[in-house]
């Protein structure tokens, strides 16, 4: 039994390292292009910060998994506490970024005149700064009440209350993501003034879908199910391994989505990574007139 568990842990950590290296490369490319090569807009600022959060999140995963593989034992608890604290911070920040992207996109479609005329110029930058501060605050409170992997806090009511509070916050963000996504879908397919499909909309939709499938369930496990051990003790270890792999997949998938959407129906031999990413964030419908204009712009790059 112990040998079987050790093999499962080894395989899981190897998968995380492989996924992490792929994700690190992709997120680093996205971050570099958005920071230095592309003109930033409201949505690209969120994507830039999301790529940074995913990059650091995967880096934490790789460090923890590599130490597990090399030592074949539980790593130093102080180091793991710090690493886990940072991972929770990055996870919450990434979820907040996705929620902000979804809300911003919904406002741009539902209230286009207000969005273009009255939206403050630096809203995205201010929102990203507030998201990092809020995520840090939640993480500090969580560590204060729970101490994370320290077993002496297992029966602490303050820790349990903080877990339920954090889970309620995750559920609130889940509702925000669902409502804003459904509103966009309704605007896309229903009504007289239907929204025209753009690559930016496809990029955001696929990113949210991957997070809902791979990222959000893991948050519920980390903050809620792992604390109710009397009910979930039989499945706890398997759920933990699954949650870790799924979070790695989620952070690894975003750059792949950007480059897939950006290169779809385009000839790759004439496309640079900069052009592909720019195309993935394109918020204009691909009518024949727009296609001609975009071809001219790309030729000038």
Curated annotation (Swiss-Prot):
It comes from the Eukaryota. Expressed in a subset of sensory neurons that includes nociceptors. Expressed in the subclass of non-peptidergic sensory neurons that are IB4(+) and VR1(-). Disulfide bonds: none annotated. The keyword Acetylation does not apply. CDD domains: 7tmA_MrgprA (cd15105). Keywords: Cell membrane, G-protein coupled receptor, Membrane, Receptor, Transducer, Transmembrane, Transmembrane helix. It is found in: Cell membrane. It is a multi-pass membrane protein. InterPro entries: GPCR_Rhodpsn, GPCR_Rhodpsn_7TM, MRGPCRA, MRGPCRFAMILY. GO terms for cellular component: plasma membrane. The chain crosses the membrane at residues 16-36, 43-63, 78-98, 129-149, 164-184, 204-224, 241-261. Residues 37-42, 99-128, 185-203, 262-301 are cytoplasmic. SUPFAM superfamilies: Family A G protein-coupled receptor-like. GO terms for molecular function: G protein-coupled receptor activity. Residues 1-15, 64-77, 150-163, 225-240 are extracellular. Orphan receptor. May be a receptor for RFamide-family neuropeptides such as NPFF and NPAF, which are analgesic in vivo. May regulate nociceptor function and/or development, including the sensation or modulation of pain. Belongs to the G-protein coupled receptor 1 family. Mas subfamily. This is Mas-related G-protein coupled receptor member A6. It comes from Mus musculus. The lineage of its organism: Eukaryota, Metazoa, Chordata, Craniata, Vertebrata.
């Amino acid at each position: 039994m112990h040998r079987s568990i050790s093999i499962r842990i080894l395989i899981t950590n190897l998968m995380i390292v492989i996924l992490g290296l792929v994700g690190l490369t992709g997120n680093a490319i996205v971050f570099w292009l958005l920071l230095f090569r592309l003109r930033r807009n409201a949505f690209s600022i969120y994507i830039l910060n999301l790529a940074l959060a995913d990059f650091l999140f995967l880096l934490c995963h790789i460090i923890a998994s590599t130490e597990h593989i090399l030592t074949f034992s539980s790593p130093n608890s102080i180091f793991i506490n710090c690493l886990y604290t940072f991972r929770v911070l990055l996870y919450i920040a990434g979820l907040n970024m996705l929620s902000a992207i979804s809300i911003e996109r919904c406002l741009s479609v539902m209230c286009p005149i207000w969005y273009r005329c009255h939206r403050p110029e630096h809203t995205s930058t201010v929102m990203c700064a507030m998201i990092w501060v809020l995520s840090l605050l939640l993480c500090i409170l969580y560590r204060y009440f729970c101490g994370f992997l320290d077993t002496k806090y297992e029966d602490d009511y303050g820790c349990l209350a903080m877990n339920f509070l954090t889970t309620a916050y995750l559920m609130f963000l889940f509702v925000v993501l669902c409502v804003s996504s459904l509103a966009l879908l309704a605007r896309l397919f229903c009504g007289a003034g239907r929204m025209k499909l753009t690559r930016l909309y496809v990029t955001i939709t696929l990113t949210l879908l991957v997070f809902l499938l791979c990222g959000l369930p893991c948050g519920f496990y980390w903050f809620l199910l792992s604390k109710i051990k009397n009910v979930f003790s039989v499945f706890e270890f398997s759920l933990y391994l699954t949650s870790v792999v799924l979070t790695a997949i989620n952070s690894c998938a975003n750059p792949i989505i950007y480059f897939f959407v950006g290169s779809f129906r385009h000839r790759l031999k004439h496309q640079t990574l900069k052009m592909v990413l720019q195309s993935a964030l394109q918020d204009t419908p691909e009518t024949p007139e727009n296609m001609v204009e975009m071809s001219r712009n790309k030729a000038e790059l």
